[in-house]
Amino acid sequence: MRDVARLSGVSTSTVSAVLNGNVPVSPKRKQRVIEAMTALDYQPDAVARSLKTGKTNAIGVVVPDITNAFYPEVVRGVEEAAQLLGYSVLLCDSREDPKTEETHLAALFSRRVDGVLLACCANSVAYDAMVRRRFPMVFVDRLPVTTAEATVSTDNVHAGYLAAKHLLELGHERIAVVVGNLALSPHRDRLEGFRKAMQESHVPVRDEYVMCGNVQVDDGLIAGNSLLSLSMPPTAIIVNNNKLSLGVLQVLDERKIAIPEELSIVGFDDYIWNRYFNPGLTAIAQSTHEMGKRSFELLLQIINRSPGDELPQPHIRIAAELRIRHSTAPARPTDPIPTQPPS
C-alpha cells in the first residue's frame, strides 16, 4: 500500500479510502490511485481484509437475461471496478423468472456476499425481501416500483424523448413505438419520454402505434407485423430494446420495405453490429460499462458506511446518446407501405 501511495502522490489513508470506499475521495486522486495500483499490479490481500473487517470481499450480480448483450457489458464494468479493489463477483441469471431470482438471492445471502447488484425481472419480489434483511443492494437498469434506497440507470425518459425528437425533426408524424413490457421501468420511462416529445410537437399518439409486450426477438416480429398490417402503417418506428429491434428488422426485410426510403427506424442499445446493418442503424446508446462501474462504487459506499450515514448520491441517472446513421431520413409523401407480406 505504501508503494501505491508513493507512486500516486497521496497518503496511505487515501489509498485505504479508495480501497474501502468508506471515505469520499476526489475523482482526480482516485484515478491516480487506481493508475498506480494497475502499474504496480497491486492486489489487495482479500483474506487479510476479510479477517480484519468480517466481510467476504465478494458481491453478487443478478441479471434477468444474460443472452441480452446489454447485461454482459454492464457486468464487465462491475468486474473491472471490483477487481481493482480486490472484490470477486458472483454472477446469476434469473432468466426473467421471479422464482429463480428469489432462489439466486437466497443463495447469495447464504454465501454471505457483502452486497448485491440487481437488475430485477418483471413482478420481482426481491426488494421487500432484501429490505427485511437490511441487506446492501443497488438496483441497476430495471428499478422496483417501490422507492429503493440506491439505484443506477440510464435516464430513460430523456432517452425516449431523444428518439422521438429526432424523428419529429425529420418531419415524421406517424411514429410508432415498440415498447416492451411496461412492468419494467426502462420501457415505462422510454414511453413517457416518447409521449413528452410528441406532446411538445402537438403530434397525437395513436393507440395502435404503441406496441407493448415482452422483450424477445419473437415479440419484435409480432409487433412489426402488426404495425405494417395497419390500414395506415407508420412512417417511422422506435424500438426500445436490441432484441426487439432484430425482430422488427427481420419483418422489414421479409416485406422488402426499403429503409429509410419507405420507413425510418431507431433502435436502442448501440452495439458494433449496428454499424454493419445495411443501412447502419440509428440508435440510442447507453453507457453500459459506466453503469456497471458506478453501480459497484455505489454498492461499496453502502457496504462500508457507518450507521446513520447518508449516501452522497443515492440515485444515479446516466445520460444516453443518439447516434445517427442511415436508417432514418426525412419523411416524404410516398405510396402507402404494403400492408401484406410478399407471397
Over which residues does each language-model region extend?
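Short beta-strand segments enriched in small/hydrophobic residues
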Residues: L7, T12-A17, K52-T67, H166, ...
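Short gly/ser/thr-rich secondary-structure transition/capping motifs
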Residues: A39-D45, K99, L118-C121, L221, ...
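Short beta->alpha connector loops
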Residues: R95-P98, A119-S124, K243
